Amino acid sequence: MKCPFCDDPNTQVTDTRENEDGDVVRRRRRCVKCDKRFTTYERVDLKMPHIVKRNGNRSEFDHSKLVGSMSLALRKRPVTTEALEAAVDRIEAKLLSLGENEVASEKVGELVMKELKKLDKVAYIRFASVYRNFADVDEFSELVREVQTRPKRGRPANPQPSGPEHDLFGG
């Protein structure tokens, strides 16, 4: 690897360590020419699928857009940054596991709603009300009733998932 200080291509690895999860390798390096030390990180670079929007346009997956939209729904809610990041990681892992080059934006939206429903019901309702573009108050009220009828201890009201929403995402 080329030295970032003197551009010499001859460097030596002096120390190598993996992070706790085993998905990042940290290497300490020393330049043979100028003797300066620097750190590099290696991680798998997985290609996220392109997103196909409702109008047919395609765009690259944007991690910051996903975090931003979820953060907006979670604004002023008691959810930690770590919990948000874990939810985003699960969404990205699910998208990668599909093995597709392209994914419909509707699928991403449904995955976001599924994660927000687990994190915070108010954030879920906020996101769903914008995402589903409710035509009237009755549709909004129905969503609120659906959330309110579920038990508060984390167990679903209907332990046997049914319907197209659950079939689409395998859960």
From Swiss-Prot:
Keywords recorded for this protein, A-Z: ATP-binding, DNA-binding, Metal-binding, Nucleotide-binding, Repressor, Transcription, Transcription regulation, Zinc, Zinc-finger
Domain ATP-cone: from-to ranges: 49-139
Entries under Pfam families matching the protein: ATP-cone, Zn_ribbon_NrdR
Zinc finger (unnamed): 3-34
Organism of provenance: Azoarcus sp. (strain BH72)
Domain of life of the source: Bacteria
Note on how the cofactor is bound: Binds 1 zinc ion.
Disulfide-bonded cysteines: none
Entry keyword Transmembrane: no
GO molecular function, one term: DNA binding
PROSITE patterns xrefs: ATP_CONE (PS51161)
Example GO biological process: negative regulation of DNA-templated transcription
The protein's name: Transcriptional repressor NrdR
Cofactor: Zn(2+)
Known role: Negatively regulates transcription of bacterial ribonucleotide reductase nrd genes and operons by binding to NrdR-boxes.
Keyword DNA repair tagged: no
Region span, Disordered: 1-21, 147-171
Family: Belongs to the NrdR family.
